[in-house]
Amino acid sequence: MDLYKLTVHELQDKLLAGEISSEDIVKSLFSRIALVEEKAQAFITLCEETALEGARRIDQQDEYGGIKGIPYGLKDLFCTRGIKTTCASRMLENFVPSYESTASKLLNEKGGILLGKLNLDEFAMGSSTEQSAFFPSRNPWDWERVPGGSSGGCAAAVAAGEIPFALASDTGGSIRQPASYCGIVGLKPTYGRVSRWGVAAFASSLDQVGILSRDVRDCALILKIIAGKDPLDATSADTEVPNYCAFLDGEVKGMRIAYPREYFQHWVTESIRTAVMKALRKFEELGAIVEEVSLPHSEYALPAYYIVAPAEASTNLARFDGVRYGLRDDEADNVIDMFSLSRAQGFGPEVKRRIMLGTYALSSGYYDAYYLKAMKVRRLIASDFAKVFRDFDLIVSPTTPTTAFKLGEQIDDTLTLYMNDALTVPVNMAGLPGISIPCALDDGLPVGMQLIGRAFDEATLLKAAYAFEQNTDYHRLTPVPGGGINE
């Protein structure tokens, strides 16, 4: 039995029916990892011994349910007690936390089994995993292409069948963009819906914990577990967390769906525009009302983001100085040189670039011209979304302007690389929930459709995504590693 092909809820059913054990699942997945990991390069750290021990312990209890006995992966910026957390950086290459992130702790308490920590762009700053200090991950649909970023290791592992789901973070599209490139589902909840405690911070007003999985039902199931108020995270929201799975079978008939003209411009490839418009017609067939709208300030989201996010990163990363933890240069003659040399050796070029951008934007004489202006743009973007949501239930757009690009193709073209997040960044700037689901293939590569919802209305978002999924077969397409598809 190819257990690696199954979703979380399918594994649940087989565990409850007594057809398989948790140990069977874990062994099957590690066999799969042994087969494809040399190409995928998705994992930074594997936890085979502890995963097998955990599975056997759960099997002895002979009591399954929820995610009990089901394996998962973590983007390697979630702190894991006793397990290395590197952020894909030389700065934290040997850092072993003494505490567990809230989100992973909630999964562990429900019986989830951690298989390993997954690759990312260093400190989540990138769109391809090529900024990892260790190695780039690869796209299972074509090993010569990127899986996206910064959560590319998570997306590659899920798409390749190495894990059924993963937790990751999304600051400007870091869950949705790789989900689109790898043909899986990627959910970024509303800002504050899930605790960020124990997750290494990039941009604190934009970061959000989310999920990568093979289908929408799995996202709904996992979100119910990890969502909610956390006393350790002041930015987590004290709002009701519904049973998201209960909403999935609702009708979309009469639902009002908007598509913004600004998200279908010439810099989005024609094949992707065509694919998403075809997907919108599927919603119309299901009884939804689809209309064009305008989000006029979204075109300014990317430049504003690259002021706000680096500004916050420059303050968040100031803590890495070689004193309490992280890489330390022992050759320095004084403490100032030690700070400077430790950071020079510990941080990669993209992280340094963003620290310098952020420090400049916050510096005396430039704060008003850059940071303050960017925050004003951010408010205008949020206002545009609010106006549309007065009359519509959902907004639909492409997730990315192109399909996955080749490794090395954009590494020296920073502006083009940043443009990969042009359609996802506005959602983070407004703090809204967004999900990417597969909606087509373009020359054998997955195309993602992005659904955007009202704040804290993930239920409607998931219902619409599930309706599309149940009336199409794109989520059932899986890659034959290296090229081609299994239908």
UniProtKB/Swiss-Prot annotation:
GO terms for cellular component: glutamyl-tRNA(Gln) amidotransferase complex. The keyword Protein biosynthesis applies. It is an enzyme of class 6 (ligase). It catalyses: L-glutamyl-tRNA(Gln) + L-glutamine + ATP + H2O = L-glutaminyl-tRNA(Gln) + L-glutamate + ADP + phosphate + H(+). Keywords: ATP-binding, Ligase, Nucleotide-binding, Protein biosynthesis. GO terms for biological process: translation. The active site is at residues 75, 150, 174. Its EC number is 6.3.5.7. One of its GO terms (molecular function) is ATP binding. InterPro entries: Amidase, Amidase_CS, Amidase_dom, AS_sf, GatA. Pfam families: Amidase. The keyword Ligase applies. Belongs to the amidase family. GatA subfamily. Heterotrimer of A, B and C subunits. Allows the formation of correctly charged Gln-tRNA(Gln) through the transamidation of misacylated Glu-tRNA(Gln) in organisms which lack glutaminyl-tRNA synthetase. The reaction takes place in the presence of glutamine and ATP through an activated gamma-phospho-Glu-tRNA(Gln). This is Glutamyl-tRNA(Gln) amidotransferase subunit A. It comes from Syntrophomonas wolfei subsp. wolfei (strain DSM 2245B / Goettingen).
